[in-house]
Amino acid sequence: MDAARRGDTQPVMWTTGWLLLLPLLLCEGAQALECYSCVQKADDGCSPHRMKTVKCGPGVDVCTEAVGAVETIHGQFSVAVRGCGSGIPGKNDRGLDLHGLLAFFQLQQCSEDRCNAKLNLTLRGLNPAGNESAYEPNGAECYSCVGLSREKCQGSMPPVVNCYNASGRVYKGCFDGNVTLTAANVTVSLPVRGCVQDETCTRDGVTGPGFTLSGSCCQGPRCNADLRNKTYFSPRIPPLVLLPPPTTAAPSTRAQNSSSTTSTAAPTTTTSIIKPTTAQASHTSPHEMDLEVIQEEGASLSGGAAGHGGTAGHGGAAGHQDRSNMEKYPGKGGAQIPAKGGSGTLGSWLSAVLLTVVAGAML
C-alpha cells in the first residue's frame, strides 16, 4: 500500500518542479538584452530600414555602436558597427591625424534595450572638404580612394586627383593604406588613398579603441598604386648599397700566409740538416782517431828501430829522446806503449793492432 502511494506521488513531484522552474526560465529569456545590429561600409548599411534587432547571449550587458570617419582633401567617408558589446557603459571620442589625413572615432556603450542608435553615422565632426576649384594644383598626382570598396580600389582602377595645398599644409605625397574598425565582434575595413603631406612614410599609423588608420607614403606621379609590399626610403637617408666581395685582398693574404709558412719552416729544415751532420761526425770520429794513432805509432816505432839499428851516439840518443817524449806527452789515441822488445815483439804488437782495426771496421 505504501509502495503504491509512493509510485503515485513521484510523477506529481516532477510535474510540480518543472512548473516552478518554467517561470524562472521564461523570466530569464525575457530579460535578455536587445540591441540594434548593422554594418556600414561607406554606404547606408546602418540606415533605419536596414537595421535589425538581436537578443544578446548570456553575460552580455551592453549594446555597442562605433563609428570611424576618414577625411582626405578630396572627400570623406565613414565605417560603423552596431551590436551586442562587452565592457562597461560609457563613451569615447578621439580625433586623429596621419600626415594630413584626418580621422574621427566615436564609441558608445549602453545597458538598455535598443539604446545603441544615438550616434549620427553620416554627419561627422570633421572639417568639410575644401572647394577644390579654389586651390591651385601643386603638380602632384595620386590615386584617390574615398569610400570605395576594395574591388574598386585595386591598382590603377581608382580615379586620379591633383594634389593642392590646404589649411597651410603642403600635400605633395601619395598615400596607400587601410582604415579598420572592430566592434561588437565585427571587423570592418576599407582602403584609403589620396594626397598627404609626408612623401616617405613607411607603414605608419594612428589607433584608437578598436580603430586603426595605417599605410605608407611615396613620392612621384601616381606612385600609390600598391604600397603594401614595398619600402620607400627617405631622401635624407642614403640607401643601402651592397658592395662586391674583395678581389685584391685575397692574393696578398695568401702571400703573407706563404711567407709566414716559409719563415717558420726554415728553422725546422736547418735543424733536421744539422742533426744528421752531428751524428755522422760523432759516428766517423773513432775511425779517424784510430788511423791517427796507427800513423803516430808507426812513426814512433820506426824512429826506435833506427835508434837501435843505427850507429852509436846520435842515433841512440835520438831513439831514447823520442821514447822519453812519448812517455811525457801521450798521443791522441791514448797512452803509448814503449817499444822494449826486438823485431818479434814489434811484429806481434802490429798484428794485434791490425786485427783490432779490422774488427772495428767490420762492426
UniProtKB/Swiss-Prot annotation:
Glycans are attached at residues 120, 131, 178, 185. It is a lipid-anchor; GPI-anchor. GO terms for biological process: cell motility; cell-matrix adhesion; negative regulation of smooth muscle cell apoptotic process. Residues 304-318 have a biased composition (Gly residues). The keyword Glycoprotein applies. InterPro entries: LY6_UPA_recep-like, Snake_toxin-like_sf. Residues 238-287, 301-336 are annotated as: Disordered. Residues 1-32 form the signal peptide. GO terms for molecular function: laminin binding. It comes from the Eukaryota. Residues 344-363 form a propeptide. Residues 238-248 have a biased composition (Pro residues). Induction: Up-regulated in suprabasal keratinocytes of hyperplastic skin induced by phorbol-ester. It is found in: Cell membrane. A lipid is attached at residue 343 (GPI-anchor amidated serine). Residues 249-278 have a biased composition (Low complexity). CDD domains: TFP_LU_ECD_LYPD3_rpt1, TFP_LU_ECD_LYPD3_rpt2. Residues 320-330 have a biased composition (Basic and acidic residues). Residues 35-128, 142-224 form the UPAR/Ly6 domain. One of its GO terms (cellular component) is membrane. Supports cell migration. May be involved in tumor progression. Binds laminin-1 and laminin-5. Interacts with LGALS3. Interacts with AGR2 and AGR3. This is Ly6/PLAUR domain-containing protein 3. It comes from Mus musculus (Mouse).
